[in-house]
Amino acid sequence: MAPTLKLQCHFILVCLLALRGESRYLELREAVDHDPFPHLAGGASPKRELEGEPLYRRALRCVDMLSLQGQFTFTADRRQLHCATFFIAEPEEFITIHYDLVSIDCLRGDILQVFDGWILKGEKFPSSQDHPLPTTERYVDFCDSGLSRRSIRSSQNVAMIFFRVHEPGNGFTITVKTEPNLFPCNIISQTPNGRFTLVMPHQHRNCSFSIIYPVAIKISDLTLGHLNGLQLKKSSAGCGGIGDFVELLGGTGLDPSKMLLLADLCYPLRGPAQMKVGCDHTVLRMVSSGKHINRVTFEYRQLEPYELENPNGNSIQEFCLSTL
């Protein structure tokens, strides 16, 4: 992977780390210090908005990442040509971005675009194979649609905006809210440890669960139509000829379609399947024909430094390969 893309993927990793624990305090403290709505500084809360509580507000940086609902304002203090904000919600949520106020000069080359998912140097999540819309329809350009599309909802728990502002003082204000997603499909995990169940009820689509960490992952339950158990098949045999299966992918980029197939599961197996993946990015992907109700339950944890320092001794092979 190119050094620039690797650096940007590491930026996402740093941002995800900053969303956890004490690191979040630093972001919120900085947000309060730069709050463009000082009269609400004392009442703004980093928690998700509750009914009757004031809307959380803060300024946006040129490059930013948010996991909070609220109202966010970007005002250019100088010419800003390469800006982006990454949004991430809980796995079971959609993200809605609403334009409250936009003051940009489209004729001069300003840009304000929403992208349904995340994209870095052409690598997308969800991939083109997994998203219900073609790539061109995943972009919503304010300069093309104006306020006729004032609210834009994502198809999964991540979204982003790109913007370019030439004139100092110009910018925009958006309100970000989340809505429940009864059957979450494509997901980026905010945390390096967790447990999740992907369910796809009679829908012909693919779902990817993304973990941007090296992890140990254990698949404890798999239901693919009439199958009740698990079998791990080496990728040379493959499950591609079967309409419903689960893949484990590893890589260093963002796009699951460009990642290495480590293993696939499509037949019964006694007991859980467990493996360690030393890649920067691990994806569990479920392919569904639409003929069945498919379900996979798994848990994952971030690998410890000592496990990565001695990969062969900890069942982690080279080139991000995994073993049982």
Swiss-Prot record:
Cellular localisation: Secreted
GO cellular component labels: axon terminus; dendrite; dense core granule; extracellular space; microtubule; multivesicular body; nucleus; perikaryon
Gene Ontology terms for molecular function: corticotropin-releasing hormone binding; peptide binding
GO biological process, one term: regulation of NMDA receptor activity
Alphabetic keyword roster: Disulfide bond, Glycoprotein, Secreted, Signal
Broad class of where this protein is predominantly found: secreted
Leader sequence segment: 1-23
Disulfide pairings: C62-C83, C106-C143, C185-C207, C239-C266, C279-C320
Pfam families hit by this protein: CRF-BP_C, CRF-BP_N
Domain of life assignment: Eukaryota
Annotated glycosylation sites: N206
Similarity remark: Belongs to the CRF-binding protein family.
Role summary: Binds CRF and inactivates it. May prevent inappropriate pituitary-adrenal stimulation in pregnancy.
UniProt-recorded name of the protein: Corticotropin-releasing factor-binding protein
Gene source species: Ovis aries (Sheep)
